[in-house]
């Protein structure tokens, strides 16, 4: 074979290889296109069945090592359309309280990145329930946790995370700079209220879906403060109560009506012999009921009920089963303030059922320990101390703290009534546990059910002190 023939032969072979390679590439492209078409058709079929594939990601940080666990669940389609929460249902009939959530945040925080918090509370939309809390701008077991017993500082912020999860930087959403706060959902968006600033000039910042819509300046210049639990939304309007003035004497109390973050009406309560702080509010048949803290002179709890026009009634829970802390032994109640051990107090709640009342309270009369729910069938109007049901949820030997109400609307539960629920803060650290340099808390929550429940204790359970405390 002469040189020219060799060149022609080699060229022919190379061309043949090139053609074969081109054919293979075309085949590969066709294969990918067919595969994509099959997948697209499968997804369209899923859509026809009204199902969604939702990926939930739980992220855990241990010793700065990031572990991502992804679980894919096929979930029957849930309507995420915005809707106005009516709030006109009555409370569901209940026989007791079922455990709903427990975040164990102090236990987890001994080794993980968990916020130092206080004043946690829960609020639900028509799609989800979230835990809201006031951070101290610090993590547990870190040097910045020192001195976090202080209530008001520029480092505090309202944040939220999915209910039942320990609040950490990786699952939490910033809501507002605040050392006093409230939040609620009207079916279309979250309203948040965050109060921050100096004691003699604090400002409440209202946000709707994360955008500032309104501000309220302290009108008495004596520590403007709000509920530390959820506000209430009825037919597109949301309602909250704020206090400004002394914590040990008559103060000023205002109810605000808010629509999409804008104040549409407000009134001041005419209640010279009452004291309203840190109110726990809920909707019931289109009206709003708030049960509050009397830090001035009552060991029973004051209440205020109002309609959407802000026409209101006020009073005190009459039962001889007293709900505040400190408080005297149960005995003769009053529909006015019970002055015995009436000074100071703690945030709490009750649910009214006609003349009856479910009273949530610490088990201890004098310290923030234990927690129990008591059903007094005539306690809203009668002054005796007889009750029918007592359910223990935190033992007398374990720390508790603030407590408050929240509800689950029929739009969330599918029930034809408003499900009553409550949360309990489990405070750890200072000022009671002096082996620590910090103050923080975890939380538990319960919801009312018309079925069997149990007496038990669900304490915080963290072993103190932490490494930073030694």
Swiss-Prot record:
PTM annotation, UniProt: N-glycosylated.
Region described as Head of neuraminidase: spans on this chain: 91-470
Top class in the EC scheme: hydrolase
Residues at the active site: 151 (proton donor/acceptor), 402 (nucleophile)
Stated regulation of activity: Inhibited by the neuraminidase inhibitors zanamivir (Relenza) and oseltamivir (Tamiflu). These drugs interfere with the release of progeny virus from infected cells and are effective against all influenza strains. Resistance to neuraminidase inhibitors is quite rare.
Catalysed reaction equations from the record: Hydrolysis of alpha-(2->3)-, alpha-(2->6)-, alpha-(2->8)- glycosidic linkages of terminal sialic acid residues in oligosaccharides, glycoproteins, glycolipids, colominic acid and synthetic substrates
Assigned EC number: 3.2.1.18
Membrane topology: Single-pass type II membrane protein
Domain of life: Viruses
S-S bridge residues: 92-417, 124-129, 184-231, 233-238, 279-292, 281-290, 318-335, 421-447
Cofactor: Ca(2+)
Intravirion-side segments: 1-6
Binding site for substrate: 118, 152, 277-278, 293, 368
UniProt region (Involved in apical transport and lipid raft association), positions on chain: 11-33
Binding of Ca(2+), residues: 294, 298, 324
Transmembrane segments: 7-27
Matching InterPro entries: Glyco_hydro_34, Sialidase_Influenza_A/B, Sialidase_sf
A GO BP entry: carbohydrate metabolic process
Subunit-level organization: Homotetramer.
Domain notes: Intact N-terminus is essential for virion morphogenesis. Possesses two apical sorting signals, one in the ectodomain, which is likely to be a glycan, and the other in the transmembrane domain. The transmembrane domain also plays a role in lipid raft association.
Entry similarity comment: Belongs to the glycosyl hydrolase 34 family.
HAMAP family reported for this sequence: INFV_NRAM
Protein name: Neuraminidase
